Each structure stands twice: as C-alpha cells, then as structure tokens.
C-alpha cells in the first residue's frame, strides 16, 4: 500500500511507545473510532436515500392528484377498492409512475455525469449541506403542492439531494477503511426498507400523504448531524483499510499503480488516466446498469399494471406493498457482504433480466394466479439488486489503487443511475401502450 501503509504503521508504533503503561487504551480508542465511522456511514446511507425512496413510494399518490383536489385528502386505510379505468383492464393513472421515476433520477444522472470532471474541486462540507437542504425542501414542496407539476419539482429536489450525496459519500469512503462501504450500502438498503415501510405504515394508519411527508423532516437533520458530529477525521486511518492478504490479492484496474499512490490525489489525474481507469471499470459498470435497468423497469413500468382486483388491497395499497417488499430485499442483500461476496456480478444481471421477462409476460398474458406469487418475485428482485450494488462497489474498492480509488468510486456511481434512467424512458411509452389495450 506504499507510503500510506507505512505512515499507518509508524503511527501505531509511536502510539505503542507512548502508552506502554496502558497498552489497551489505543486499541480501545481505535475500536471506538472504527465503530463511530461505521455507524456514521450507515446513517449517512440511510438518510441520503430516504427522500428518494419515499418519493417513489408516493408516486401513485402524487399522480392521483390529477383526479383529486390536491394531496391533502385523507387516505382511506380500509379495503375499499378504488374506481377502475373502464377503458382498460388496467387501473391506470393518466401518467405512468415512470414520470416520477424520471424526475427522481435524471437530475442525479446529470450530477453523476459531471462529478468526475470537477465536483472534487468543491469541499465535502458544502456538498453535504446542499444535499441536506434539498432533501428537506423536497418533503416540504411535495407535501404542500396542489399540482402534479409542482410535486415533480419537489421530486427533483430529492433527486439532487440523493445524487449529490451518493457521489460525495462514496468518494469519501476512499479515505476510510474499506469496511465502511458495506456499512454505507447497508444504510442505503435500510433507507429503502424504512422509507417505503414508514410511508406504507403511516398512510395505512390513516395519515394523509401531506402529514406523512412532513413527519420525515427529521431525516435531513440526522444526515447533517451524522456527517458533522459523528464521523471522525480520516487522517489517522489507513484509507484502504485492507489487511496484507487483501492488498496482495488486489488486481489493479490499470497497470500504472505506483507504490507511493494514495487516496486524495484524484484531482491530479490526467484525462488520459481517468479514461484508462474508466475503461477498466466497465467490467463492473455494465452488469450494474443492466441490473438496475431491469429492476426499475419492473418497479416503475410494471408495478402499477400488476393489479389484482380480487384482493382486499386497493390499487394504491398494492403499489405500496410492492415497493416495501422490493426495498426489504434490497436491504437484506446490501447488508450481506460479510456473509456472501459475489465477484461475477454479470450473473445477477442475467437473473434480473429473467425477472423482467417473467413479469412483463404476466402483465400481457395475466397467467400468475395470486398476488402472493408477485410478492415473492418482487422480494427476490430486491435481493438481486441489492447484491449487485454492494458487491460492485466492494470489488471496485479492492481492485483499484489508492491513487485512483476516489475517482473510480465517483465514476462507477453512474451505473445504477444510467440503468434507472433508461428504464424510465422506455417505461413511459409502454405504460401508454398497455393502458390503451381493451
């Protein structure tokens, strides 16, 4: 690991010399720092993705505003079904929920495309502040909106918050032990589960969408507190956080690694070097793009059309349950890195594409007899998506040099966002086509 590893060893040696009379103190302090950073990154992952997830869970309610006087109407918790579109066998909104997906992802795509070119010039603290303010603004704007257009502007704020935060915090992991990537990923999975479950639970209990969204304003405050008050300075830590076995097993994505390379120097990379690193990342980027394309095509293109009339759940309630079960699967698999590591993530891409084919066929042919079968498939879909995310970034962290890791993490962020954006673009015309079928 070069000079950074050597400086870490010298720091350990000096600590041992200074504390011979109390040999356990430095070790306990080190453990305390590691746990603070681990918990800090888990909370950051949770808070960063929370508004993004809530907006997708609320997508059906946001679009129903075209058929109601704003979103402040009370949500009926009971089983009374909603009126159906008489012109189609699907109970369709006039606009696909993919419209909310696009508003929730396109600003993130722009941020991630531009991030590797110059975002590193802006210090981390202002980025985190902007992310927190945008998150709070999204909840307030959607809560008080009286139109779909204004609500979508609030969704855009959530997208800016999530996209800027993800690029920022994943880049920041380059300065901490590699284990924090697992904690970050678990936190983002927790955001999916807690975000969708909280929206489902509060609306199911009878709370209006407006009050449900306003009750979540503490999340941006928690994000800022975690970054400014909980995380410790990364300087004393080995940025890669690897043991000797991990270092020896590393297979650099490019062949120009030098023993003196260290994280934090990505601003000094030439365009040619950035392009070389990016080409090496394609082995991981392409499978993750496919995974996210397939799962979000399902989530925002097909969920609304996988409607069962012979259940006690209304259409809106079915949609919220789909979102919650998907996020439960994501949380479980994003938290599984210590138990199961997958190097060949293209296998996950293949399985997710098979999920898409199965559910698209069911939308067209209506051959799955029970909503509970759909529940199982959606849970499995979430497991595949979460596993692809955490293993992709873990593999990149292990297989990039210290000098290139910060840039590599920023560049790889484009994978999920690109797949999601493509799925939203294709899901919109599919929705219109299917909803006009008799």
Curated annotation (Swiss-Prot):
Residues 1-37, 149-151, 204-277, 368-438 are cytoplasmic. It is a multi-pass membrane protein. The chain crosses the membrane at residues 38-58, 128-148, 152-172, 183-203, 278-298, 347-367. Expressed throughout the brain, such as, in the cerebral cortex, hippocampus, cerebellum and several different cerebral nuclei (at protein level). In the cerebral cortex, expressed in all cortical layers. In the hippocampus, expressed in the granule cells in the dentate gyrus and the pyramidal cells of the hippocampus proper. In the cerebellum expressed in the granular and molecular layers, and in the Purkinje cell layer. A lipid is attached at residue 435 (S-farnesyl cysteine). The modification Cysteine methyl ester is found at residue 435. The modification Phosphoserine is found at residue 14. Induction: Expression is osmoregulated in renal medullary cells. Signal peptide: none annotated. Residues 436-438 form a propeptide. Glycans are attached at residues 71, 85, 310. Disruption phenotype: Embryos are viable and fertile and by 12 months of age do not exhibit obvious clinical signs but have significantly shortened life spans. Mice show elevation of lysosomal enzymes in brain and accumulation of autofluorescent storage material in neurons, retina and other cell types that increases with age. They also show neuropathological abnormalities with loss of certain cortical interneurons and hypertrophy of many interneuron populations in the hippocampus. Residues 1-27, 67-87, 239-261 are annotated as: Disordered. It is found in: Lysosome membrane; Late endosome; Lysosome; Membrane raft. A motif (Lysosomal targeting motif. Required for AP1G1, AP2A2 and AP3D1 interaction) lies at residues 253-254. GO terms for molecular function: calcium-dependent protein binding; glycolipid binding; sulfatide binding. Keywords: Cytoplasmic vesicle, Endosome, Glycoprotein, Golgi apparatus, Lipoprotein, Lysosome, Membrane, Methylation, Phosphoprotein, Prenylation, Synapse, Synaptosome, Transmembrane, Transmembrane helix, Transport. GO terms for cellular component: autolysosome; autophagosome; caveola; cytoplasm; cytoplasmic vesicle; cytosol; early endosome; early endosome membrane. Highly glycosylated. One of its GO terms (biological process) is autophagosome maturation. Its main location: membrane. Homooligomer. Interacts with DCTN1, KIF3A, RAB7A and RILP. Interacts with CLN5. Interacts with KCNIP3. Mediates microtubule-dependent, anterograde transport connecting the Golgi network, endosomes, autophagosomes, lysosomes and plasma membrane, and participates in several cellular processes such as regulation of lysosomal pH, lysosome protein degradation, receptor-mediated endocytosis, autophagy, transport of proteins and lipids from the TGN, apoptosis and synaptic transmission. This is Battenin. It comes from Mus musculus (Mouse).
């Amino acid at each position: 690991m070069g000079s950074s590893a050597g400086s870490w060893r010298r720091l350990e040696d000096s600590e041992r010399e200074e504390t011979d009379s109390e040999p356990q103190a430095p070790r306990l302090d080190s453990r305390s720092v590691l746990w603070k950073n681990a918990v800090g990154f888990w909370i950051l992952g949770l808070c960063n993705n929370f508004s993004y997830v809530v907006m997708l869970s609320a997508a059906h309610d946001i679009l129903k505003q075209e058929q109601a006087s704003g979103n402040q109407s009370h949500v009926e918790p009971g089983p009374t079904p909603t009126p159906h579109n008489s012109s189609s066998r699907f109970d369709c909104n006039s606009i696909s929920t993919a419209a909310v997906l696009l508003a929730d992802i396109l600003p993130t795509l722009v941020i991630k495309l531009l991030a590797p070119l110059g975002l590193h010039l802006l210090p981390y603290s202002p980025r985190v502040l902007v992310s927190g303010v945008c998150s709070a603004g999204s909840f307030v704007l959607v809560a008080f909106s009286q139109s779909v257009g204004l609500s979508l502007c609030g969704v855009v704020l959530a997208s800016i918050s999530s996209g800027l935060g993800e690029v920022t915090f994943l880049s920041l992991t380059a300065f901490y032990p590699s284990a924090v990537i697992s904690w970050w990923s678990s936190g983002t999975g927790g955001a999916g589960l807690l975000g969708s479950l909280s929206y489902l639970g509060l609306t199911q209990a009878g709370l209006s969408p407006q009050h449900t969204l306003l009750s979540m304003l503490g999340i941006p405050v928690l994000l800022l507190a975690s970054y400014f008050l909980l995380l410790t300075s990364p300087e004393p830590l080995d940025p890669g956080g690897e043991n000797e076995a991990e270092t020896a097993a590393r297979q650099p994505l490019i062949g120009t690694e030098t023993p003196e390379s260290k994280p934090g120097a990505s601003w000094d990379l030439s365009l040619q070097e950035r392009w070389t690193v990016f080409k090496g990342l394609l082995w991981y980027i392409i499978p993750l793009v496919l995974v996210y394309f397939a799962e979000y095509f399902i989530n925002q293109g097909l969920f609304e059309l996988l409607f069962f009339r012979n259940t006690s759940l209304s259409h809106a309630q079915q949609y919220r349950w789909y979102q919650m079960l998907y996020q439960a699967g994501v949380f479980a698999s994003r938290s599984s890195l210590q138990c199961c590591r997958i190097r060949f993530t293209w296998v996950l891409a293949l399985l997710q594409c098979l999920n898409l084919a199965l559910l698209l066929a069911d939308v067209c042919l209506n051959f799955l007899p029970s909503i509970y079968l759909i529940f199982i498939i959606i849970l499995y879909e979430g497991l595949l998506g979460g596993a692809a995310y955490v293993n992709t970034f873990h593999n990149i962290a292990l297989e990039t040099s210290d000098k290139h890791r910060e840039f590599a993490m920023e560049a790889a962020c484009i994978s999920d966002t690109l797949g999601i954006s493509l799925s939203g673009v294709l899901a919109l015309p599919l929705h219109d086509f299917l909803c006009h079928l008799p």
